[in-house]
């Protein structure tokens, strides 16, 4: 929270029963900060704080609480208090909240929600998970294209108090088809007698309810939007997506990508709140896949067993070659995956990527293998031929690893597979196997084993 209030101060005021003073302090704070403090308190005390707050303020605090705390509150407040919270919460926040609750809590919530809002909630819940429809809100302002500016402003003043999106308004025709958008600034600065259809902007970006939320987030980023209309297959306006919800989507998608890049199945749960069994379940499958795929490395070593028996010292350099190759491939893969996510790189750029990674890998490989040659030759006394074999192996491994790391995510994207899957663990497994083959083959050629 802000420096003006501390957790210890709240505890002290509670223990001294100075509730009026505590209330005055809390209502001056941002609801998000109050929600953070609320999360720190045990059940007996947090409900005292919650009931102490004014109803409109407490409902806003409620929307920022974790699902666990929200459930705790709902289980311990009256039906009348639930009704007020539900009516005061924005619809999209209400839907997000309901999706996290068990059936008995959902029944209690819907029982204390107005018929109109309950109908809207049920409608929103029908949209597919991770679709544009699932993250939109219907609390927006729209005008008919036949309105004058004065009529629109009068209408705005009448309904804006209950709407989530008020900076951008939407214009529809008599069939509810979206025909334009108009900002509040444009509305206020326009002549009262002008028609909305003459002042609106017809160059807008919209998405369908079924469109993927990740693609929607990309459009927000590309066009620098704060609000985007959502339409049905007949271009009728059904909702809008606001930037605060898209930020949540971006966070969610980034988290999923990071988890996939670490060879885990994505999870929406917070780490400290997720059970041990759940964490193990999300990790074990990919670990099994990678463990089995790593047997190829063992097969290569077994094939060249005679080479190793003839020159045991070659085994000393295997970990260094494999680790360097894996790291080199991961660097390229990470940059390409990020470029794909930001729509900076497409499959059609694959030749450009290969050419760039080739040049980078030659430069990096030359420097690393040169340093490595000198290090091995002068400090390990392994001899010129051995030092040369290791250096050339490293040079070729880095080139191969960087090209593979750059190409695999693009191939995955073209096959409609998440590029994040083609990340560090998988690329490392492929590179390890190839690096060993290069190393042993060069050893046979140069060392005459």
Language-model regions, residue ranges each:
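Hydrophobic packing positions in regular secondary-structure scaffolds
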Residues: 1-265
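Alpha-helical membrane-interface segments at transmembrane helix boundaries
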Residues: 273-285, 289, 301, 305, ...
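Interfacial loop-to-transmembrane junctions
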Residues: 411-431
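Juxtamembrane/disordered regions of integral membrane proteins
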Residues: 338-352, 374-383, 415, 422, ...
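Non-transmembrane, extramembrane segments of multi-pass ion/lipid transporters
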Residues: 245-279, 328-353, 410-414
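Juxtamembrane "helix exit" motif at the C-terminal ends of alpha-helical transmembrane segments
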Residues: 291-308, 371-382
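Membrane-water interface of transmembrane alpha-helices in multipass transporters/channels
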Residues: 303-317, 380-392
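Alpha-helical transmembrane segments in multi-pass membrane proteins
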Residues: 31, 286-294, 317, 321, ...
């Amino acid at each position: 929270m802000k420096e003006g209030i501390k957790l210890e101060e709240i505890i002290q005021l509670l223990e001294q029963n100075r509730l009026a003073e505590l209330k005055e302090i809390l209502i001056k704070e941002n609801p998000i900060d109050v929600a953070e403090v609320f999360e720190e308190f045990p059940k007996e005390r947090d409900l005292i704080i919650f009931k102490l707050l004014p109803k409109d303020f407490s409902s806003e605090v409620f929307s920022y609480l974790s699902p666990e705390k929200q459930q705790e509150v709902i289980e311990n407040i009256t039906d009348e208090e639930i009704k007020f919270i539900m009516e005061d919460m924005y619809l999209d926040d209400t839907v997000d909240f309901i999706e996290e609750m068990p059936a008995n809590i959902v029944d209690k919530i819907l029982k204390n929600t107005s018929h109109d809002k309950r109908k809207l909630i049920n409608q929103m819940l029908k949209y597919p998970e991770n679709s544009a429809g699932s993250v939109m809100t219907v609390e927006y302002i729209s005008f008919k294209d036949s309105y004058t500016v004065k009529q629109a402003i009068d209408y705005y003043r009448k309904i804006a108090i209950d709407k989530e999106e008020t900076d951008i308004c939407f214009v529809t025709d008599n069939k509810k088809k979206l025909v334009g958008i108009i900002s509040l600034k444009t509305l206020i600065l326009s002549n009262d007698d002008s028609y909305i259809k003459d002042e609106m902007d017809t160059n807008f970006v919209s998405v369908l309810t079924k469109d993927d939320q990740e693609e929607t987030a990309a459009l927000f980023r590309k066009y620098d939007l704060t609000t985007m209309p959502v339409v049905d297959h007949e271009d009728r306006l059904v909702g809008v997506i606001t930037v605060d919800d898209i930020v949540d989507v971006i966070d969610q998608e980034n988290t999923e990508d990071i988890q996939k890049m670490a060879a885990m199945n994505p999870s929406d749960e917070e780490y400290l709140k997720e059970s041990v069994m759940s964490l193990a379940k999300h990790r074990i499958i990919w670990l099994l896949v990678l463990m089995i795929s790593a047997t190829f490395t063992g097969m290569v070593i077994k094939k060249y067993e005679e080479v190793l028996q003839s020159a045991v010292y070659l085994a000393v350099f295997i970990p260094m070659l494999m680790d360097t190759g894996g790291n080199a491939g991961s660097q390229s893969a990470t940059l390409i995956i990020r470029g794909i996510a930001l729509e900076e790189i497409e499959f059609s750029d694959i030749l450009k990527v290969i050419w760039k990674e080739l040049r980078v890998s030659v430069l990096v490989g030359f420097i690393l293998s040169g340093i490595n040659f000198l290090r091995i030759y002068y400090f390990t006394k392994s001899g010129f031929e051995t030092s040369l074999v290791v250096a050339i192996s490293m040079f070729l491994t880095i080139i191969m690893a960087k090209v593979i790391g750059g190409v695999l995510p693009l191939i995955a994207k073209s096959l409609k597979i998440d590029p994040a899957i083609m990340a560090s663990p998988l690329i490392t497994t492929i590179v390890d196997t190839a690096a060993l083959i290069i190393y042993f083959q060069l050893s046979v050629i140069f060392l005459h084993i």
